[in-house]
């Protein structure tokens, strides 16, 4: 594969350049979008909020407006315009899902989702019940797996979109390593340290009543390309990627920072890394940043001194909206439609 040559050349990623924040333009666009929403013009309003967000990516109120418009449209049964992807290439081969879990209930719930969305696929679930660390467990799982397409994921996730398998294969045809949350600028101790406009996630949070808190971070969609760091809740790539860039089980012998390490090394090696936002999962956990995490964060910085943060972590501010789980996929379809469109002039 092409990336095998790139592995011989390690490069330090640079910070991507974005247009400067234009608060004046963002405010004009935001107020126009609010007026359109009040008039019930949800499609135009959502598009306007998207433009406002691109002008000022650090303002989550525009993301909130997009979510509100998308929910109104989804509840009305109005479907977002579809992109014809029939000719897009798909990665071929068996799919191996590798999960470390000591919770039978979580594992059974995840397997139920996988059975549903992969029912027409050639796939397998590799369960590691006694992992000493995620690196050790995932490495052992990879040795057991038969698939060409490898997925490492947590056991406390669920899958929202029914065409998950097709989306996964499309993304793996275009990229070497993908996740569902991440950043195109690696700095600090976590994937979201840099903040907007670099960070992106559409991961939702489930509620006890079955609804989802739909998250929206980053004015990108439905893909953030050239990612430098990915969150480990869900990582996928071809088998050769993980064989060429193995998990560092010696340094990260616990359950933190293994994901930052692996994805950052993949980026440094020149692999095509991306955040595939439209894979649409929910995650039960909001993350654990206690003493154990800090210990491994220190190891990460010791291994890669260039990641030493020059500023405090950016606030993790995301648009969030409670929606019925059945409406999450059509809601995010509108988000993808608006964020994929180009900017237009202000009337």
Predicted regions: what they are:
Residues 274-294, 299, 303:
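Active-site donor/metal-binding and catalytic loop motifs
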Residues 158, 162-201:
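Conserved donor NDP-sugar-binding/catalytic core segment of glycosyltransferases
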Residues 150:
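Short aromatic/hydrophobic "clamp" motif used to bind/position activated sugar donors
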Residues 229-230, 239, 243-264, 271-282:
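Donor nucleotide-sugar recognition loop
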Residues 80-89, 99, 103-119:
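Short, well-formed alpha-helical segments that are part of the catalytic scaffolds
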Residues 131-145:
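Glycine-rich, basic loop-to-helix element that forms the pyrophosphate-binding segment
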Residues 210-237:
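A recurrent flexible, glycine/aromatic-enriched loop bordering the glycosyltransferase active site
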């Amino acid at each position: 594969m092409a990336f095998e040559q790139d592995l011989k050349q390690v490069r330090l990623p640079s910070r991507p350049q974005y247009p400067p924040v234009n608060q004046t333009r963002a405010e004009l666009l935001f107020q126009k979008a609010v007026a359109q929403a009040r008039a019930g013009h949800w499609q135009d309003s959502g598009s306007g909020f998207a433009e406002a967000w691109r002008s000022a990516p650090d303002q989550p109120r525009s993301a909130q407006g997009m979510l509100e418009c998308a929910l109104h449209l989804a509840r009305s049964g109005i479907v977002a315009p579809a992109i014809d992807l029939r000719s897009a290439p798909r990665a071929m081969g068996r799919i191996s899902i590798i999960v470390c879990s000591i919770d039978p209930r979580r594992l059974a719930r995840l397997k139920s989702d996988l059975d549903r969305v992969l029912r027409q696929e050639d796939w397998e679930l590799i369960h590691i019940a006694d992992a000493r660390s995620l690196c050790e467990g995932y490495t052992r799982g990879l040795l057991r797996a038969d698939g060409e397409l490898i997925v490492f994921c947590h056991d406390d996730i669920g899958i929202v979109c029914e065409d998950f398998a097709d989306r996964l294969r499309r993304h793996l045809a275009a990229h070497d390593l993908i996740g569902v949350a991440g950043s195109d600028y690696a700095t600090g101790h976590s994937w979201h340290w840099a903040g907007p406009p670099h960070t992106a996630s559409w991961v939702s949070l489930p509620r006890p009543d079955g609804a989802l808190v739909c998250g929206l971070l980053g004015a990108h969609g439905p893909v953030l390309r050239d990612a430098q760091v990915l969150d480990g809740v869900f990582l996928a790539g071809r088998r050769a990627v993980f064989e060429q860039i193995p998990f560092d089980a010696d340094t990260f012998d616990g359950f933190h920072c293994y994901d930052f390490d692996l994805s950052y090394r993949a980026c440094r090696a020149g692999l095509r890394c991306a955040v595939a936002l439209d894979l649409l999962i929910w995650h039960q956990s909001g993350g654990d940043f206690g003493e154990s995490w800090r210990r491994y964060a220190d190891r990460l910085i010791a291994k890669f001194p260039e990641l030493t943060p020059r500023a405090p972590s950016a606030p993790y501010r995301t648009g969030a909206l409670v929606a019925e789980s059945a409406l999450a996929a059509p809601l995010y379809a509108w988000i993808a439609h608006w964020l994929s469109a180009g900017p237009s002039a202000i009337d």
